[in-house]
Amino acid sequence: KKYLMICSALLAFPAMAQDTYENARLLGNDLNGTARYVGMGGAMEALGADLSTIRTNPAGIGLFRKSGVNFSLGVVSQANANAKLDHSATKLSFDQIGFYRTMRTGQTSYVNFAFNFSKGTNFNYFLAAADHLNNASLGKQAYLKGMRGSLSNGGYSIGTGSGSNVDTYYGYIDNSSNNIARNYGQLDYLYWNTRLVDKNTPSLFGYDAANGYDFNRSQRGYIGNYDFNISGNVNDRVYLGLTLGLRTVNYKGYSEYVENLVNASNTAIGTATITDERKVKGTGFDLSAGVIFRPVEESPFRIGLSINSPSWYDLKTENYTTIQNDGQNQGKWEHGKSSEVY
């Protein structure tokens, strides 16, 4: 058997699209927190007196008059989970735990300290899909991009490397450039160096179409929010708060994609299998401040205002992608591997 392996961190493979895709996982937050907060749909920025407002409006912690502890559990359930990827249908989720400490500073004034852990995003998820393909394939897509000849035409120019990479195919900006085209990614590399180049005649390019596919993806992990708060009130009318938030990111995903290959007569000739394992780890932080004002002393009516900074992250992404060439019209290699770290 012949094998192909590359560590693309050593090459100029573009990671912009993948980087944007991975960062999109960090956007937004799940509705997690105390039972009261979740039951109210998170609309408690002006009400306060709930640990989960520690991020949305830190002044809400200033309404507490007694110290306390709070924790919440949740259940993540997804039907038709796939045992093949070791993904169970139901998982217990520890969503929130925290405490608050109150200190009286006057007859109607307090200074409070609080800490709260919550899951900002729960990544536990499974997806399975299968359908027909009308003579399309990922190999066909990579082939057509190579035939366009340049980045300006929506593709790239296929050529070999130099030195120890003289037998390796790359997609360049055009036929006069030594720079890798930004649309030449890991899958393009794997296909051009496993399936699209004839093993006996390297100058002959070709692809196999497919009439169906099977796709499975399993992902796990979460974004952990660790929030530290100081807050208080002035004469039980004005409530102020400040929160420092620390974030931890722990994501792991695995996907498997299988195409059923066919020849020009629509006869099955094997499969092409792509697997991808991806990890994202890192830390981040943000700041938030808030105020709640009770304009009428005899009324519980309150007005809340808060400001939240963006979250700054320092992330490390690793991925490992393979292709298994099990078609009859095998190309140059039977198996390919590619990894990236950024």
Where would I find each of the regions flagged by the language model?
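Asp/Glu-centered strand-loop micro-motifs enriched in Gly/Pro and often flanked by an aromatic residue
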Residues: 39-52, 83-86, 213-219
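Short charge-dense sequence patches
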Residues: 2-7, 41-53, 238-241
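Bacterial Sec-dependent N-terminal signal peptides
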Residues: 1-22
